[in-house]
């Protein structure tokens, strides 16, 4: 049996450790220090590093970890990942016998040009593509790419557990409620998340079913989202990609409920 543990780093990063009683897979190690501390405390042997994209807060700890453990580094083939030994692209499958774990690789460009996600055993490690109630900023791709990447993730089973790389949930919910204020599942989620954050507990993993019900970026064909996006854009939007682009731009500039278009 494997477990997934969130090692916290920086202000709001989660470095996910997939492990059993002996071995560990390290996902997106932006900082080696908290990872080393946790591995030592748990007496675990790391077997590999897996990175979803090249941003430093996901890769900054690789060099020290590789220096200490001499383990392989997996990452997107089209991005410069420090020390990468195994470049990956959609269609590749990773097998870690020590963990009885198999992961399928998906290309999910948008946040970065070569961003990948990994799915296996009803777990999705999606880096900065999909967040709980949100999605990543579009730095290197375009709205169409990001929309397509998110739609690809929605094709996974509803019971999939979503392990994103940042604790953005509460801020994302506040934006989602500005767009979709009457969504009862969103209102309930906000209450549950506020309670967890008051106790300094992670709000992750989410589930794909929950995201489909509450995440505006996955619901761009829904009337409430279309209406709010059109009000923000100042014109009637008729296709989901335009709706997505509008609410992504809105989120980039969102400062609170006072931003709700009149």
Curated annotation (Swiss-Prot):
Domain of life: Bacteria
Enzyme kind, highest EC tier: hydrolase
GO biological process, one term: methylglyoxal catabolic process to D-lactate via S-lactoyl-glutathione
Cofactor: Zn(2+)
Catalytic activity: an S-(2-hydroxyacyl)glutathione + H2O = a 2-hydroxy carboxylate + glutathione + H(+)
Transmembrane annotation, as ranges: none
Keywords, alphabetical: Hydrolase, Metal-binding, Zinc
Binding-site list for Zn(2+) 2: 57-58, 128, 166
HAMAP family linked: Glyoxalase_2 (MF_01374)
Record-linked NCBIfam families: GSH_gloB
Subunit structure: Monomer.
Name recorded for this polypeptide: Hydroxyacylglutathione hydrolase
Species of the source: Nitrosomonas europaea (strain ATCC 19718 / CIP 103999 / KCTC 2705 / NBRC 14298)
């Amino acid at each position: 049996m494997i477990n997934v543990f969130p090692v916290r780093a920086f202000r709001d990063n989660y470095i996910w450790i997939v492990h059993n009683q002996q071995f560990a897979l390290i996902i997106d190690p932006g900082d080696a220090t908290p990872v080393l501390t946790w591995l030592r405390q748990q007496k675990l042997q790391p077997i590999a590093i897996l990175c979803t994209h090249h941003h430093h807060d996901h890769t900054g700890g690789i060099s020290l970890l590789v220096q200490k453990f001499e383990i392989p580094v997996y990452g997107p083939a089209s991005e410069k990942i420090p020390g990468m030994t195994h470049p990956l692209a959609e269609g590749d499958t990773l097998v870690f016998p020590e963990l009885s774990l198999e992961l399928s690789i998906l290309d999910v460009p948008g946040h970065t040009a070569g961003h990948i996600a990994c799915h296996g055993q009803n777990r999705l490690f999606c880096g900065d593509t999909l967040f709980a109630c949100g999605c990543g900023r579009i730095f290197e791709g375009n709205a169409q790419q990001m929309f397509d990447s998110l739609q690809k993730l929605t094709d996974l089973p509803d019971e999939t557990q979503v392990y994103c790389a940042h604790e953005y949930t509460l801020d994302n919910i506040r934006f989602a409620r500005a767009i979709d204020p009457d969504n009862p599942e969103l209102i309930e989620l906000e209450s549950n998340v506020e309670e967890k954050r008051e106790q300094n507990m992670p709000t992750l993993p989410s589930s794909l079913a929950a995201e489909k019900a509450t995440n505006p970026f996955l619901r761009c064909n829904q009337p409430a989202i279309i209406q709010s996006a059109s009000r923000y854009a100042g014109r009637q939007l008729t296709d989901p990609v335009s709706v997505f682009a509008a609410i992504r731009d809105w989120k980039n500039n969102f400062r609170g409920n006072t931003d709700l278009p009149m």
